[in-house]
Amino acid sequence: MGEFSLTHILLLAVIFLIFFGPSRLPQLGQSMGKAIRGFKQGLNEIDVDAKDIHDNQQVSHQNKQSMGQTQKQGENQNS
């Protein structure tokens, strides 16, 4: 019941032709393509930012661990 068949797609295409006319359909398709590309670029930027944050957190955690080990080694040498 919720599936799209070839008939549904053709019916939608005819409705778009009636509403927008054959001259505006290429412009509409081009605009939709640009919008989809922009959306995908935005998602990629979010992924890159999230990865950068994750990498920075790992480096910070590693630095804290190495500082703790350095302090322990210094205490052991002083004893």
UniProtKB/Swiss-Prot annotation:
Superkingdom, taxonomy of origin: Bacteria
Any one GO MF annotation of this record: protein transmembrane transporter activity
Compartments it resides in: Cell inner membrane
InterPro entries named among the record's database cross-references: TatA/B/E, TatA/E
Native species: Bdellovibrio bacteriovorus (strain ATCC 15356 / DSM 50701 / NCIMB 9529 / HD100)
Keyword annotations from UniProtKB, A to Z: Cell inner membrane, Cell membrane, Membrane, Protein transport, Translocation, Transmembrane, Transmembrane helix, Transport
Primary location group: membrane
GO cellular component: TAT protein transport complex
Oligomer status and interactors: The Tat system comprises two distinct complexes: a TatABC complex, containing multiple copies of TatA, TatB and TatC subunits, and a separate TatA complex, containing only TatA subunits. Substrates initially bind to the TatABC complex, which probably triggers association of the separate TatA complex to form the active translocon.
Described function: Part of the twin-arginine translocation (Tat) system that transports large folded proteins containing a characteristic twin-arginine motif in their signal peptide across membranes. TatA could form the protein-conducting channel of the Tat system.
Keyword Transmembrane: yes
Polar residues composition bias: residue spans: 56-79
Annotated segments matching region Disordered: 52-79
Protein family: Belongs to the TatA/E family.
Protein's recorded name: Sec-independent protein translocase protein TatA
Bilayer topology annotation: Single-pass membrane protein
A Gene Ontology BP annotation from the UniProt entry: protein transport by the Tat complex
Protein's UniProt keywords contain Transmembrane: yes
Residues that span the membrane, as ranges: 1-21
